[in-house]
């Protein structure tokens, strides 16, 4: 009987151990289930108010009451609409927890939202470089593409049976989304580079530095956009990364738009001096700008050589805001002829040539007046700002003005 009692005791102990293990496993699963939505909800709780603020601010904040800011306002409002669409997406996730209730519906909503927002984001950015970019044809094209994409996504998610075919179709749609985003981003980059070329050929000041954020944001948007597309299909416990990563991304966008407002008028005036019609703009122009070849200009520059030399002697290049149009009027010549002369003679763009003259002027001042401060030196040499002067000086000389002064005056 004692042996039988020992057997019963062992069975009871084993049963209790199994129950304890099951309880621990169940408890751990409950913790996991509880923790994932809480982190996910916290990330949405953090991002959603910011998104709503950015969206409504972009839509309704005032700009200076000048006609020239009309295009900036339209661009910012389009960006505001995109931000509010994303906010609506976040709200559905936050208040209804759709990802945990119906994953297919969440994927459809995310992909459809991203597709539409890609169009809005690219349109808003390119508008800052090309006021004629948005046309009825382009708007309808993007709307039709969005409807087709959303419809196909719905068919794949809700009508196709789960399996290899559905996964392959989802992968194809994800590739379409990414390619669409990359194509739009490429348009922004082409527009940006075209604008930089225009500024370098026509402006003495480094106007391009004011639109550099467009290039930075676009490359960031490509990485972020592709990441969002991939994170849509990741396990639930990693989704909060997608939400939290949006905070610095959209914060940078907000800061850039606010900062650009300070320089927009100067940039737009630079555009207006050289772009007069829709044909000259950079909308769909994906080729290099037409450059005057040496064969198309007179072989001899005898007439202009003396004029340019005399103008350099007067230190006319230190004038801030100087343009090739103004210089051509001073020298009584035309812009095409002057631009070709600069490229052929100095192997530089107009801006690079003027910058080199200003830097030589600054170095001469440093030699004669080593006590001068950098801010005054930058202004007297014709540079827009102290930082712009230091950047240009360092790029050419390989050291800062302060180090150059010590090395050359000791």
Which role does the model predict for each range below?
Residues 27, 31-151, 168-172:
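N-terminal low-complexity or simple alpha-helical regulatory segments
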Residues 56-59, 120-128, 180-200, 254-256:
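Alpha-helical transmembrane segments in multipass membrane proteins, preferentially the mid-helix core
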Residues 215-284:
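Hydrophobic, helix-length membrane anchors
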Residues 67-88, 142-143, 168-231, 241-250:
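Alpha-helical transmembrane segments of multi-pass integral membrane proteins
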Residues 257-376, 381, 392-395, 402-410:
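Membrane-proximal linker segments that couple transmembrane helices to downstream signaling/catalytic modules
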Residues 1-8:
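Short, small-residue-biased leader/transition segments that mark boundaries at the very start
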Residues 63, 91-101, 153-165, 226-235:
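Juxtamembrane "helix-exit" motif on the non-cytosolic side of transmembrane helices
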